[in-house]
Amino acid sequence: MSVHAIQHPLVKHKLGLMREAGISTKSFRELASEVAKLLTYEATQDLETQKTEIPGWSGEMLEVELLKGKKVTVVPILRAGLGMLDGVTDLIPSARVSVVGLYRNEETLEPVPYFEKFVGDLDERLAIVIDPMLATGGSMVATLDMLKARGCPLVKVIVLVAAPEGIARVQEAYPDVEIYTASIDERLDENGYIVPGLGDAGDKIFGTR
């Protein structure tokens, strides 16, 4: 598994703004989408293309390169992953959207599934799983379990912030999955939150804090 901590100055700047204690819901939501878009650019550099003929503006046929095959499904983990969805689909507007609903048991810190809806032909698609935080890794591994059980051959993960513990858990379960993140933070605290992290990203995106 490869872990890509993106070092682009715009990514660092926008993530830095997101860490401010008094950030508004509007600003946090906008920045989450913007960082997701920048990470998506990095994560999709190896998408396959194929040469295709199209009619050009002059009336002549042109040979261009377009994405090959069934392409991509984006998989936001509810609810916080929805805050990154627009950023991803801005770059890949033809992507189909699958949805996984998980919540964390606050005593065991393990994920509990409550909803799933996947697009068809998963065996022919790249799945991009999005969630603001990769903390313990439980929700991410549970989502990867669902995708792999349905025959999805290639999965990438995009998170705004990752903890070393979460990375290690994904790596142990699925060494073939690539992770793209704006930051690998220090650690998890006793409650399973990333330090320094972003706080509760779902609450900040939806204004329920």
Curated annotation (Swiss-Prot):
5-phospho-alpha-D-ribose 1-diphosphate binds at residues 79, 104, 131-139, 200. It comes from the Bacteria. Its cofactor is Mg(2+). CDD domains: PRTases_typeI. NCBIfam families: PRK00129.1 (NF001097), upp (TIGR01091). Belongs to the UPRTase family. This is Uracil phosphoribosyltransferase. The gene is upp.
